[in-house]
Amino acid sequence: MDQFQRNGNKHRSWQQFFLYPLFFREDLYAIAHDHHLDRSSSSEPTEILVSNFFSFLTVKRSIRRIRKQKNSISLFGNCSPNKFLGCNKNFYSKLILEGLTVVLEVSFAMRSKHFIEGMDGWNSIQSIHCIFPLMEDKLPHSNYISDIRVPYSIHPEILVRIFRRWIRDAPSLHLLRSILHEWKNSFSRENLQKALVTQRENTRFSLFLWNSYVYEFESFLVPFVKRFSHSQSLLYGSFPDRTHFDKKIKHIVIFPRKISTKRIWLLKDPFMHYVRYGERSLIALKGTHLQVKKCRYHLFHFWQCYFHLWFQPYRVCSLELSKTYSSFLGYFLHVKMKPLVVRAKMLDDLFITDLITIELNPIAPIRSILFFLAKEKFCDISGRPISKLSWTSLSDDDILDRFDRIWINLFYYYSGSINQDGLYHIKYILLLSCAKTLACKHKSTIRVVREELGSELFTKSFSKEREFISSSFSKTRSQRERIWNSDISQINPLANFWQKIQNKQIEN
């Protein structure tokens, strides 16, 4: 596969136009088997037992069956090769799908790389860590923010149409069409979104379909945003001091090219800020109310004509930044108008200018966290701590570790919020709930638990090592700056949890 990827530029036609022979390479399914084995190593033991009896002879027979199939392909039916081994009926279907996905991913990666190289100024950072800089970003040129939810009622023919843009091999398209229809029918009446986004165990094939679908949406945003651009290209000379160079544009004198030996650069004002997680997207734009409505109309029109999908009006919400706040991934993004006085002196004249900058301040939703703790029986509706009765059968160390893990997850996720006092109120609730749980287990009181454990209740549970790390960083940094503890293993579950809650609130 590495050699296949390295020779991409030389044999690009084979990758884009003749993918069908690659679908029947046995080594690709060996790669898919290794990937499936690594991913399922921490799952059920039966899945690992099944993988030990994996047979490439069965894969060859499945490939031969696909090749000789005339009308339709039954990959998701009863395909258990050996009932004596108790093999999962979908095991070989998953491996075949992952083998097909390996070929599609390589070709898709080359196509996306070629597209990004052709688009100037398009930097796509595919990580959740790029969301946090947006929450601290300054929006000097934006006055509207649009909350977009990507539609997920995807028909298989729409996905086939997307593949036709970069796959010209007719047998490959017919094979993909048959697999997609069979794959959708395997979920009966469930929405395809549950298979793509909210499936309990996302397969490699489902993730590839969702990424391809969203890629088409984001690739449309590049020319779409350039059309509604309000910034003009400006020329400026290079400076030894590059700090806040965009504020010095008005004071630059452009010399003729015959005299100037400086390098001429091209600059565009940062008028747009875009971030996406899952099906939620936030776009900060500059323009009037009429222009934002036109932008919203063109987005509706594009989605209905290109994807043949009905775009519900509630999926796009455009609000003015100075009058409201938005919620994203469990944060409330509060907009703060910050006035700034600038004095500029030119010869004997003194000019005073008032500038207003827009800043986003992330706020932790304390009420929502209290509601979640009350739902999980850590406290009541009013926020009064109660004992966790379902944990009284555990050992003391397990109880302390579980409460410690809950607080660490919340502290990591909301470490950059401006309302840290509310987080310590949550910590106080968890601490008393932990003490009451231990007291209920030993049939004693909270005072007795504190006397027996002493400082161990506060050191072993709710350890302050991570808070000490943040405080040591804060000594060397400005007090206005915030520190984000970007632990990807703790961020993703909470982000998905708040995403589901907000989607239910919008739909209801």
From Swiss-Prot:
<protein>
    <recommendedName>
        <fullName>Maturase K</fullName>
    </recommendedName>
</protein>
<comment type="similarity">
    <text>Belongs to the intron maturase 2 family. MatK subfamily.</text>
</comment>
<dbReference type="Pfam" id="PF01348">
    <property type="entry name" value="Intron_maturas2"/>
</dbReference>
<dbReference type="GO" id="GO:0006397">
    <property type="term" value="P:mRNA processing"/>
</dbReference>
<keyword id="KW-0694">RNA-binding</keyword>
<dbReference type="InterPro" id="IPR002866">
    <property type="entry name" value="Maturase_MatK"/>
</dbReference>
<comment type="function">
    <text>Usually encoded in the trnK tRNA gene intron. Probably assists in splicing its own and other chloroplast group II introns.</text>
</comment>
<dbReference type="GO" id="GO:0009507">
    <property type="term" value="C:chloroplast"/>
</dbReference>
<dbReference type="Pfam" id="PF01824">
    <property type="entry name" value="MatK_N"/>
</dbReference>
<keyword id="KW-0150">Chloroplast</keyword>
<keyword id="KW-0819">tRNA processing</keyword>
<dbReference type="GO" id="GO:0008033">
    <property type="term" value="P:tRNA processing"/>
</dbReference>
<dbReference type="InterPro" id="IPR024942">
    <property type="entry name" value="Maturase_MatK_N"/>
</dbReference>
<dbReference type="InterPro" id="IPR024937">
    <property type="entry name" value="Domain_X"/>
</dbReference>
<dbReference type="GO" id="GO:0003723">
    <property type="term" value="F:RNA binding"/>
</dbReference>
<keyword id="KW-0934">Plastid</keyword>
<dbReference type="GO" id="GO:0008380">
    <property type="term" value="P:RNA splicing"/>
</dbReference>
<keyword id="KW-0507">mRNA processing</keyword>
